């Protein structure tokens, strides 16, 4: 309805999809021949954990969101498989923890085109923060930021540890001014500009639509987003009809950026994603999930994600019935 205010009159047609049925999902994709597909599905939302008592929430939160990767990965991976099976090449935008799910899919030949949020929540906040500190208009500020979902949650959620590496280059009116700032403070304080809770999801939605338009309309937009073509973490990217291209400044190589994001992933619950897509949980993540939920898993292969996701949901439901009514 709101699109009418902007002179836009899209046709909207809801269709029920069972993403556990890859064959039927493939048939639907072949029938509809979409230019782009956006995955907004997840089996268990992180925000349910906030409903637990504060001390228990804080304990589970300290396992990091990567602890719930089976729940975050399963449906998006099924959709990616259906897209591949269709033989078509739509832009695939994955919104579900794309810093960690996209690289798993990338290892098994199912890489989404791009993710959303995470670095793309941090980057506009950094620009806003610098504008506030300098009194300069946001339009005069440009940044190049390599960071991870971990940098987004560390200032916001209980139990996350500091020290995740990142890269930040700041320019004002084309002049490099990075040395004028404490970049760790900039990153932390910028994230704190967001209110607590889930209100930030409106910015996540903006990130999603921005990425969609940039590719469908071939805008060649220089922006930030996570998981381009299956890479871990977030990067400066250019989005166009060609898809996603990482665009780094000369001060940092792609290999260095990837290594930074892999190191950050270890502070987000994931020790390693192996070449065959096997996910290895960090030891602290394993211990906390075992202690709080009775969920015991040190590593898993992508094809095991579904069963583990249902096991995680059952463990959470059993725990939640004690506290959530």
Predicted regions and their residues:
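Conserved Rossmann-fold cofactor-binding substructure of NAD(P)-dependent oxidoreductases
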Residues: 16-34
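Redox-cofactor binding/interface segments in oxidoreductases and associated redox assembly factors
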Residues: 37-39, 94
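NAD(P)-cofactor binding segment of oxidoreductase domains
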Residues: 54-88
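Rossmann-like dinucleotide-binding core of oxidoreductases
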Residues: 77-84, 88-171, 202
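Glycine-rich phosphate-binding loop and adjoining beta1-alpha1-beta2 segment
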Residues: 1-22
């Amino acid at each position: 309805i709101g699109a009418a205010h902007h002179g836009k009159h899209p046709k909207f047609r809801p269709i029920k999809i069972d993403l556990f049925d890859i064959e039927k999902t493939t048939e639907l994709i072949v029938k509809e021949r979409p230019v782009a597909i956006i995955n907004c599905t997840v089996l268990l939302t992180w925000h349910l954990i906030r409903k637990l008592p504060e001390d228990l929430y804080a304990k589970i939160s300290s396992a990091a969101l990567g602890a719930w990767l089976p729940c975050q990965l399963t449906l998006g991976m099924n959709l990616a498989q259906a897209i591949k099976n269709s033989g078509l090449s739509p832009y695939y935008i994955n919104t579900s923890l794309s810093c960690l799910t996209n690289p798993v899919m990338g290892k098994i030949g199912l890489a989404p085109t791009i993710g959303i949020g995470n670095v793309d929540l941090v980057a506009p906040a950094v620009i806003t923060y610098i504008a506030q500190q300098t009194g300069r208009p946001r339009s005069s500020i440009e940044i190049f930021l390599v960071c991870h979902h971990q940098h987004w949650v560390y200032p916001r959620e209980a139990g996350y540890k500091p020290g995740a590496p990142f890269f930040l280059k700041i320019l004002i009116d084309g002049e490099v001014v990075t040395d004028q700032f404490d970049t760790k403070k900039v990153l932390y304080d910028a994230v704190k500009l967001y209110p607590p809770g889930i209100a930030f999801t409106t910015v996540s939605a903006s990130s999603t639509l921005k990425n969609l338009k940039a590719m469908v309309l071939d805008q060649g937009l220089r922006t930030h987003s996570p998981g381009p073509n299956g890479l871990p973490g977030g990067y400066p990217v250019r989005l166009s009809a060609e898809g996603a291209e990482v665009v780094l400044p000369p001060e940092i190589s792609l290999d260095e950026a990837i290594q930074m994001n892999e190191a950050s992933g270890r502070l987000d619950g994931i020790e390693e994603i192996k070449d065959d897509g096997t996910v290895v949980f960090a030891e602290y993540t394993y211990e906390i999930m075992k202690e709080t939920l009775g969920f015991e898993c040190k590593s898993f292969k992508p094809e095991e994600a579904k069963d583990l996701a249902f096991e995680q949901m059952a463990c959470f439901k059993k725990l939640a019935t004690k506290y959530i009514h």
